[in-house]
Amino acid sequence: MNKSMTAKLTQLSVRLEELNRLLSSESITVNLDQYRKLTRERAEIAPVVDLYNAYLQSEQDIHTAQEMAAEAEMREFADAEIRDAKERLVRYGAELQKQLLPKDPNDERNIFLEIRAGTGGDESALFAADLFRMYARFAERQRWQVEIISQSPSDVGGYKEIIAKISGEGAYSKLKFESGGHRVQRVPATETQGRIHTSACTVAVMPEADEIEDVALNPAELRIDTFRASGAGGQHINKTDSAVRITHLPTGIVVECQDGRSQHKNKAQAMSVLAARIRDKQMQEQQSKQAATRKSLVGTGNRSGRIRTYNFPQGRITDHRINLTLYKIEQIMDGDLNELCSALLAEHQAEQLAAMAE
């Protein structure tokens, strides 16, 4: 292990002790935002420090075994212990190198998930609903919370657009590579000739801002309109202008929210989504600049590019960024995304390691 890695790991060990002291303070929960930030930081560095301690213990085990090897009757045992400890040392060292790769500061954040129907008409809207169910089922497996913020149903039962908030540890880290174009090839239920149709949806995964103040929202640059929410009617028919539309004039970003029962709740949710979209736009611009200097397959978050094809007749899903094809479409559409997410993360880490070596 080189000196810079050792220095960084020692620094993290000291910081963990400091965080433990701060989080054990009786007054820490007075500022909940600060408490969340410190808790998130501790959750991020504690596993790294634990791994470093295991690495140091392996070094100590080698030293102890070498001393034992001086005694003839202990030499065979000591040699086996040295081999085992050296294997652990190599394994821990490689893992620590990965752990010290540049961290995405958004990895532990909650997310806003947006799915929009694209080409393909009704079939695209139905696929948007299928994608939402896939992500909702994945969230359920992770014990995350899913809250629909806004939805625009289609006439056939799908969604022209749906926005949801997914809350849970590491939500962004696991789903951040889902942004982009998703193409589906299948025979629609309305197709009488058995022909395969191709349609597409666009997915955007955006990290939630800790506070709306994280994004500079000048009230003078916002146009806020209220209108009557559309719905099924009945006893809960909306007789007031509770739906809210917010337009960010400098960027032209528009957010509508009408799923909440009150104008106050709809406005608060719309502001949260707006802050996330503006922040996401800034991130995309930054990533585009980075992509211009080096090729990145999975880390750009390009919304316009087709990232994945779902071919139902063949039972396969292909991720075009890493040339991965899995013949388990039913399991994946039911929320079994772990293999896909892990493969994309591994490719991203390989790119980071290659960039560090340049």
UniProtKB/Swiss-Prot annotation:
The primary location reported for this protein is cytoplasm
Q: GO cellular component annotations, sorted alphabetically? A: cytoplasm
Reproduce the UniProt comment on modification after translation: Methylated by PrmC. Methylation increases the termination efficiency of RF1.
According to its UniProt entry, this protein's organism is Nitrosospira multiformis (strain ATCC 25196 / NCIMB 11849 / C 71)
Q: Check the record and name the SMART domains matching this protein.
A: PCRF
Cross-referenced Gene3D superfamilies = 3.30.160.20, 3.30.70.1660, 6.10.140.1950
Q: Does the keyword Cell division apply?
A: no
Compartments it resides in: Cytoplasm
Q: Does the keyword Zinc-finger apply?
A: no
Which residues in this protein are found as N5-methylglutamine? 235
Main function? Peptide chain release factor 1 directs the termination of translation in response to the peptide chain termination codons UAG and UAA.
Would you tell me the protein name for this molecule? Peptide chain release factor 1
Q: Per the similarity annotation, which family is this?
A: Belongs to the prokaryotic/mitochondrial release factor family.
Sorted alphabetically, which PANTHER family does this protein's record hold?
LD18447P (PTHR43804:SF7)
Pfam family name, one: RF-1
